[in-house]
């Protein structure tokens, strides 16, 4: 019996310039480039073992063997590496998620980035991180950006080979995030379904794609300048424009809950009345992420704590 083992840790990320909509659904090539901040506090550890002792792939998540449907998705991803290497041995995948699901943080980004990294090691491919990100992308679009720390761009590209992650900045300055947990309930409309509806029906969508390119260029300059006000303002504007495309879809849909609006208003009040640079962004869900200086997190938590219970506030 022969086996090869690979072990990798990958961190989740929060998009500041959003990805919303696919140009190529099969290859997960997006309609626009995006940019995220990797969260060092939240990650997935994955171990893979390629072995001829198995007749089918096995997938364990947090110690529990997963069902056929979940394993089938993993198998499709593993097949990308089998196709590249010619190694058809079945694989045991063991993943541990250290991502607070109650915070509404998608673990798919860190999960598929970690799986790609582990397979890269076990198969002996040893692809550089940028090239490996083209594999991670095929599992989950946002996983493309989880191969690097700090600020990371997912360059849209126009092919499987060049739609990849590009490290922008190590984020080694005074920047942090707070997650406001509004709801941990399952979304009524999945991100995939929401994207498809928006792309096909929203009259605002074309403008969103154009403006996202401008936002990306602007935020990269703001990052270079270490300007937290500009970083936050651009991210807030970009996120709200994305949600506006959904409101104009047919039929319209919205991920906001009443508490999402309260959180937005509270953050604006902190910014305008306390003079603390605090900005918000939201993904395809009701939870709100606060972009701020890491040194301001205690003061912002104090203000948010007047509105939300402490267990709903997660600093990173």
Where are these regions (language model features)?
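ATP-binding N-lobe of GHMP and related small-molecule kinases
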Residues: 1-103, 117-127, 303, 314-316
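C-terminal nucleotide
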Residues: 3-10, 169-316
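Fold-independent oxyanion-binding glycine-rich loops
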Residues: 10-13, 19-20, 96, 109, ...
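Conserved hydrophobic/aromatic beta-strand scaffold that supports enzyme active sites
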Residues: 45-47, 151-153, 177-179, 289
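Short amphipathic alpha-helical segments
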Residues: 69-73, 111, 128, 259, ...
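Gly/Ser-rich oxyanion-binding loop with an adjacent helix/lid
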Residues: 83-172
């Amino acid at each position: 019996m022969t086996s090869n083992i690979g072990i990798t840790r990958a961190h989740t990320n929060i998009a500041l310039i959003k990805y919303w909509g696919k140009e190529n659904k099969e290859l997960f090539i997006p309609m626009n480039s995006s940019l995220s901040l990797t969260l060092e506090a939240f990650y997935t550890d994955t171990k893979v073992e390629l072995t001829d002792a198995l007749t089918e792939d096995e997938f364990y998540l947090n110690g529990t063997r997963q069902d056929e449907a979940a394993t089938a998705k993993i198998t499709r991803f593993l097949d990308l590496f089998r196709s590249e290497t010619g190694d058809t041995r079945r694989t045991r995948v063991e993943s541990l998620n250290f991502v607070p699901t109650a915070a509404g943080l998608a673990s798919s980004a860190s999960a598929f980035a970690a799986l790609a990294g582990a397979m890269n090691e076990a198969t002996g491919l040893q692809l550089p991180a940028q090239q490996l990100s083209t594999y991670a992308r095929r599992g989950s679009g946002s996983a493309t950006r989880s191969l690097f720390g700090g600020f990371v761009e997912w360059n849209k590209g126009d092919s499987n080979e060049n739609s990849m992650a590009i490290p922008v900045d190590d984020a080694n300055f005074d920047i942090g995030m707070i997650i406001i947990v509004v709801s941990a309930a399952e979304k009524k409309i999945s991100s995939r379904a929401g994207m498809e509806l928006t792309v096909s029906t929203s009259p605002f969508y074309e403008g969103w794609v154009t403006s996202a390119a401008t936002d990306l260029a602007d935020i990269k300059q703001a990052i270079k300048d270490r300007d937290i006000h500009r970083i936050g303002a651009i991210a807030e504007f970009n996120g709200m424009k994305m949600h506006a495309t959904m409101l104009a879809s047919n039929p319209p849909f919205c991920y906001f809950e009443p508490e999402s609006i309260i959180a937005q208003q509270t953050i604006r009040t902190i910014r305008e009345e306390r003079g603390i640079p605090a900005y918000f962004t939201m993904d395809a869900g009701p939870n709100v992420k606060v972009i701020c200086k890491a040194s301001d997190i205690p003061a912002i938590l104090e203000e948010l704590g007047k509105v939300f219970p402490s267990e709903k506030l997660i600093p990173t």
